[in-house]
Amino acid sequence: VPERTALNVHFKSPTDDYVKMFEQMEQDKIISTRGLKPDAVKYGELVFDVNSAYFYNHGGYEFAKQFYADAYKAAIKIVGGEQYILSAVMHADERNRAMSDALGQDVYHYHLHVVYIPVVEKQILWSKRCKDKSLVGTVKETIQQVSMSKKWDSKPALDEHGKPLLNANGKTVLRKSY
């Protein structure tokens, strides 16, 4: 419904087109494309969608705005930080035809779209070619790697005292995240 487009809520508006925003984040070293394949997925989208009747029964537009403001906060946690979110908009301009017809009045379908860059934290280790042999195998840098893969998202396995478990070589044992 075009006359309701102004009621859409932009929790985060894009500053440019997504490709340019991606390139700027790469230049600013917010993200890394190190090892990224040419056909890799560079963008993700979360859609928070709740049955129209829920909002209709709980206060409509104002209730939906607060609900999706909270959902946006959850999205920030899900994607790892607001800096990775390119845009987030709650749509308030789409009419639910079936409910509207059944109730004899306009009922709108509220939902939230969040477009983001998927990242995982990745530690880059010093290689065997490093001149200072004491550094080999230690963390050289930590990057935010653009990736939909969750294999880098593994967390250390902890003992009953909360300390990381080590394998026979003294390296931290990781719990698989997938």
Predicted regions and their residues:
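N-terminal nicking endonuclease/strand-transfer module with a His-rich metal-binding environment
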Residues: 1-178
